[in-house]
A protein has these predicted regions:
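Helix-capping/transition residues at the boundaries of transmembrane alpha-helices
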Residues: 32-33, 93-95, 120, 178, ...
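Specific transmembrane alpha-helical segments of multi-pass solute transporters/efflux pumps
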Residues: 20, 24-25, 53-105, 111, ...
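Hydrophobic transmembrane alpha-helices of multi-pass small-molecule transport proteins
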Residues: 107-109, 115, 125-147, 264, ...
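Helix-helix packing/entry segments at the starts of transmembrane helices
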Residues: 43, 101-107, 172-196, 227-267
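Specific alpha-helical transmembrane segments that line the substrate/conduction pathway
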Residues: 39-49, 81, 89-123, 133, ...
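Transmembrane alpha-helices of multi-pass small-molecule transport proteins
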Residues: 32-84, 109-115, 166-170, 187-207, ...
């Protein structure tokens, strides 16, 4: 396979992932019309976990974690990355638009290095990193207070920000633990455990049960879209891209997702997004760019070379004038 073909396939997978995860917020909005948030999230990961578990079996993966360390990883991940994260996400999205929800959640890649700095001895956060975290927080505050809202939208933004915190903290904690189970079985068990916890939390929060849900073809379609495509298939695409293009470039999908979410919410749900929300997104994106400036530099340079913005300078190339100046004098 040629490099060009591989690049085009990677771009197609990246775009597919951005579209799936971006439109997931629209599907959540549809489901929340009739489903309580924790129960909705539980049903999503009942199905997603089962699909991914079957995929792991067909792919000849080890079907379950082995030993205490691997089960601890599954327990922490299921609690923080699935249970807490999606309970907060679905609850928060009741109060805000799809675009706002996606933008607030895009603070996760900014918060993750902050937790890593405090919990992982090899991680360091310099002054630029702290400024990046600050910009991300400023962006979140701008969005929370946009349109003069200090009621429902503020509550929604706070819940969504806590969802981002849960994801970032859980990611670092899982990385810190010694267990290293196979990826697909680990994720499927995390999803199933998280779904079980959400089923427990739902009645504790006073949510009505399944018998009260006014099911419709649209709601069923939204649930299956979220579970099968956004969660199970999206997870597989994510790890394929992670292996092919690396962590920095795949993290950029976090900033394509809010654009897709805002556009899909506007096109299909009639949602509007104000200038203050756009400004908040710019703050968050700037914070991420500042934190990852060194890692992003080779990617940006390569992108500029591929698009012809800058010319590729090969080792040994010299400016003609400098070559003339440095040439030895005639004897």
């Amino acid at each position: 396979m040629s490099i060009g073909t591989q690049t085009h396939r990677n771009l197609a997978l990246f775009a597919t992932l951005a579209v799936l995860w971006g439109t997931s917020f629209m599907a959540i909005e549809v489901g929340l019309e009739v489903l309580p948030p924790a129960l909705f999230a539980a049903l999503r990961y009942d199905v997603a976990g089962a699909v991914l578990f079957i995929y792991g079996l067909l792919a000849a993966e080890d079907w379950r974690p082995r030993g205490r360390d691997e089960w601890v990883v599954v327990g922490i991940g299921g609690t923080l990355l699935i249970g807490a994260h999606f309970a907060l996400l679905f609850s928060g999205q009741r109060y805000v638009t799809s675009g706002v929800a996606a933008i607030v959640l895009s603070t996760s890649p900014i918060l993750t290095p902050l937790f890593a700095w405090s919990m992982l001895p090899d991680e360091r956060l310099d002054a630029g990193g702290f400024v990046g975290v600050f910009l991300g927080l400023v962006g979140t505050v701008v969005i929370a207070l946009s349109s003069g809202s200090v009621g429902g939208q503020l509550a929604g933004v706070v819940l969504l920000f806590l969802a981002a915190v849960s994801w970032a903290f859980g990611t670092v904690l899982v990385k810190r633990l010694p267990g290293n189970p196979p990826v697909v079985p680990m994720q499927s068990w995390m999803m199933l455990l998280g779904a079980g916890l959400l089923h427990v939390v739902s009645p504790v929060l006073g949510e009505p049960g399944l018998t009260t849900v006014a099911w419709s073809p649209l709601v069923v379609a939204a649930l299956l879209f979220l579970a099968v495509l956004c969660s199970a298939a999206g997870f597989i695409i994510y790890f394929v891209l992670l292996d092919r293009i690396g962590a920095i470039e795949i993290n950029l999908v976090s900033y394509a997702v809010p654009i897709v979410a805002a556009l899909s919410g506007w096109a299909f749900l009639g949602e509007q997004i104000g200038s203050a929300t756009v400004a908040g997104f710019v703050f968050i994106l700037s914070g991420f760019a500042l934190m990852k400036r060194r890692a992003l530099a080779p990617f940006v340079y390569g992108l500029c070379v591929r698009t012809g913005v800058v010319a590729l300078r090969l080792v040994g190339d010299h400016d003609p004038a400098s070559t003339h100046d440095s040439a030895p004098a005639d004897d």
